[in-house]
């Protein structure tokens, strides 16, 4: 997983860790562990982040460099 991308996209969008923690209904400390790679982020939270940032889970985890979300079927 490309953990650097979590921090990169958050900073690009001018959010603090505490802002994203609220979106994910978790603590800033927990979210920090995700960004640092100390804990694996659950799939449900990745999906929530992808929707929040209007991108794909594939982009967040580094499977693609295309930031646009996948087209809806």
Stretches with model-predicted labels:
Residues 2, 6, 56-57:
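Hydrophobic side chains within well-formed alpha-helices
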Residues 4-23, 48:
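Short basic helix-loop element that most often maps to the first helix and adjoining turn
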Residues 12, 61-73:
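Short, charged recognition helix plus adjacent turn
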Residues 25, 44-59:
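DNA major-groove recognition helix of helix-turn-helix/homeodomain DNA-binding modules
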Residues 25-40:
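Recognition helix of helix-turn-helix/homeodomain-like DNA-binding domains
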Residues 35, 53, 61-64:
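DNA major-groove recognition helix of helix-turn-helix
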């Amino acid at each position: 997983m490309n953990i650097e991308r979590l921090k990169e996209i958050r900073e690009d969008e001018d959010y603090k860790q505490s802002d994203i923690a609220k979106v994910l209904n978790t603590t800033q400390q927990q979210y920090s562990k995700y960004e640092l790679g100390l804990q694996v982020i659950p799939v449900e939270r990745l999906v929530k982040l992808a929707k929040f940032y209007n991108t794909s889970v594939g982009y967040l985890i580094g499977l693609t460099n295309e930031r646009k979300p996948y087209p809806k079927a």
